[in-house]
A protein has these predicted regions:
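Structural detector of well-ordered beta-strand residues that form the stable sheet scaffold
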Residues: 37-40, 61-63, 85, 92
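Structural motif
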Residues: 49, 58-61, 89, 140
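Substrate-binding/access-modulating region of protease and related hydrolase catalytic domains
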Residues: 1-58, 69-72, 96-104, 108-110, ...
């Protein structure tokens, strides 16, 4: 974290959780004084676990995980400090030794929100962490029955990016979500997976290359 601060990072993702640590608290205070957005995972210790840091630090955007239906990840740690949720159940990720793996957890969700924060800063570089938090909360998707365990709701990059544009800015195209291809409900693993294991190796076929261009005079991207 000290290295990230020295190198001038605008967003720091903290996909880890544990007890409060004085050295980490000091580093967070330094990062906050330099207007660095910090996003952390709530943790995966379940609803009865003590609150975890750094997510519980007031300077940090705390992220929990949801499944494909928008429901809270069963193993997610809980607390009133959660800011938003993001997809974090059975997500296909790059594997450490190549290929891909399917993984679940609030760490995955935190990285998702860190990516949204980076896009917001690219679109509007003068946003500070408090403004990023506000945009994420105000544009989050809420279910028919709001769930306080999800904070403000599930972070949604499209309305968040549009909210980051000043109304007086000319020539900045708005963002629209492209159609999403259906995802198969099953994936084939190369070897049997033991019960209770939370990751499995998978090798989906590579997608066909695509090119996209953006017409600044219109509101959507075209293939």
């Amino acid at each position: 974290m000290d290295w990230s601060i020295r190198e001038g990072a605008r967003v720091i993702n903290m996909s880890f959780a544990g007890p409060r640590d004085p050295m980490m608290t000091r580093a967070i205070q330094v990062a906050a004084s330099r207007r660095i957005a910090m996003i952390a995972a709530m943790g995966n210790e379940g609803p009865g676990a003590p609150i975890s840091y750094p997510a519980a630090d007031p300077n940090v955007i705390a992220v929990t995980a949801t499944d494909q239906t928008g429901r809270l990840f069963a193993a997610a740690s809980q607390g009133t400090h959660v800011t938003v949720a993001a997809p974090g159940v059975e997500i296909i990720l790059p594997a450490p030794r190549g290929g891909y793996q399917i993984s679940s957890g609030t760490s995955v969700a935190a990285a998702h929100v860190s990516g949204i924060a980076a896009l917001l800063l690219e679109r509007q570089p003068d946003l500070d962490p408090a403004q990023l938090r506000q945009i994420l909360q105000e544009t989050a998707r809420r279910g028919a029955t709001p769930d306080p365990q999800l904070g403000a709701g599930v972070a949604d990059p499209v309305p968040a990016l549009n909210a980051a544009v000043r109304p007086t800015e000319p020539g900045v195209p708005m963002v629209t979500a492209p159609p999403v291809a259906p995802v198969p409900d099953t994936a084939q693993a190369p070897a049997p997976v033991a019960p209770g294991t939370d990751t499995a190796q998978a090798a989906p076929p590579p997608a066909a290359p695509r090119q996209a261009t953006v017409d600044p005079g219109k509101a959507e991207a075209k293939d």
